[in-house]
Amino acid sequence: MSRSFFIDESGQDQRASPYEVLAGLAVEDRRIWPLIRQLSDAQQHFFGMRLFEAYGREAKAQKLLNRKTFRLAGQMAAIAHADRTRLAHELLLDGSKVTRERLTALGQAKIAYCRFALRLARSHGAVVFATIVPRTAPRPTKASALRKDYAYLFERFYYYLNGLPEQPMGYLVFDELDRSACHILLEQVSNYFVRTANGRTRARLIIPEPFFVHSDLTTLVQLADIVAYTISWGVRLRTMTEPSRAELADLAGDVMALQFNRRLDSGERQSGFKVINDLRPAG
C-alpha cells in the first residue's frame, strides 16, 4: 500500500510565529477516505456543520487555536457537549448573535475538535514529520536551490518508507500556492530528485513530482496545518529556546505522540522532527 504525505506550513511570515514549520502527515492510502469521512463527521459533531460551510474557506489553525480561542473557552466552566454544539452552531450560522455563552462554546468546540482530530489520525496509523526553523535562520538566495527544510523533510519521508516491510511508494501533496510559487517549488523539487545523489536515491520510494491541492477542499492538508501550528507555538524540542504557549501543552502532547520514531538494529534512532538553523544548501 502506498503512502500519501500531506504537507503544509506555519510561520512563513517570519513575524509573529516563533518558528517556521514545514509539516507532513503520512497516511496509508486505504486509510485516507475513512479518516476524511470521520473528520467530516467530527466537525458536524462539534460544530453542528462543516467548517467550510461556516467560513467559506479553510479553517486555519491560526483561527482555531489562537490565544483568543483559549481566552474565550476559559471564561466559563466547561459546557455540556449537546449545549456546546448548539451554541457554537448558532454563532457560526449568524455571527451577529454574539453572547458570552456562545463565544465560550465555540472556543471550547474548536479546541476539542483539534484534539479529537489529532487522536483520530493516530488511530488510523498516521504519523507526522516536521522541519522546524528559527526566524533568524539564514536563507538561500538562489531560486533554483531547494531549501534544507524541504530536503530534510524528504529525507525523513524516505527513512519512514524504507523501513516499512513492503517499502511502499510515497506521494507528495502540497497546499497550492499562487501559480508562480508552485512552478518555482516544482523546479526546486525536480532539481533535488534529479540532480543530487541523495535525491536520486530517495526517488526510488518518493514520486518526485508533487500534487498541489486547494487546502480548503482537502481535509488532511488542513490537519497538517494544525500539526505545523501546534509545533511552532507549543512543541519544544531540546534545542528550541523560544517560549511556548502553555495552553497548547495538551495539543503538543498529541502531536508528539504522532511523531515518526524508529530504533534501528544498530541502535540508531530515526525521528520525524528536525530543527534546522541554516536553510542554505550545503556547499
For the regions a language model picked out, list residue spans one by one.
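Phosphate-ester processing/binding pockets and catalytic centers
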Residues: M1-G283
